[in-house]
Amino acid sequence: MARKKEFRYRGYTLDELLNMSLEEFAKLLPARQRRSLKRGLSPEQKKLLRKIRLAKKGKYNKPIRTHSRDMIVLPEMVGITIHVHNGKEFVPIEIKPEMIGHYLGEFALTRKIVQHGSPGVGATRSSMFVAVK
């Protein structure tokens, strides 16, 4: 039976990533995310990070909600559920190790998948001559 492979980000385990400073972790990220972290976190992102740290300690028991879709998923966020705004509502997202280095907004889709109903009368040329029920 195959054992589940242990998660690694750029060769580092989750425990090693958790022990790194933000600057050390930023060096592992792709250029766009590295540049974003190098510029520093916005006040909204700092507030979100503060809430996440409190939730990890068990001192913040309300759902963590944010509009900050441009926040990069950091190793310390793993295991927490964050409600990310998609423009209409807050979508609950459980942070998994595989999400590290991505933006929160990538996981809360802003567009709904179109599910077409059955076509109405007059939708096609042949349906114009079908009797209406």
UniProtKB/Swiss-Prot annotation:
Keywords: Ribonucleoprotein, Ribosomal protein, RNA-binding, rRNA-binding. It comes from the Archaea. One of its GO terms (biological process) is translation. It holds the Pfam family Ribosomal_S19. GO terms for cellular component: cytosolic small ribosomal subunit. InterPro entries: Ribosomal_uS19 (IPR002222), Ribosomal_uS19_CS (IPR020934), Ribosomal_uS19_euk/arc (IPR005713), Ribosomal_uS19_SF (IPR023575). One of its GO terms (molecular function) is structural constituent of ribosome. PANTHER family: RIBOSOMAL PROTEIN S19P FAMILY MEMBER (PTHR11880), SMALL RIBOSOMAL SUBUNIT PROTEIN US19 (PTHR11880:SF2). Belongs to the universal ribosomal protein uS19 family. Protein S19 forms a complex with S13 that binds strongly to the 16S ribosomal RNA. This is Small ribosomal subunit protein uS19. It comes from Thermococcus gammatolerans (strain DSM 15229 / JCM 11827 / EJ3). The gene is rps19.
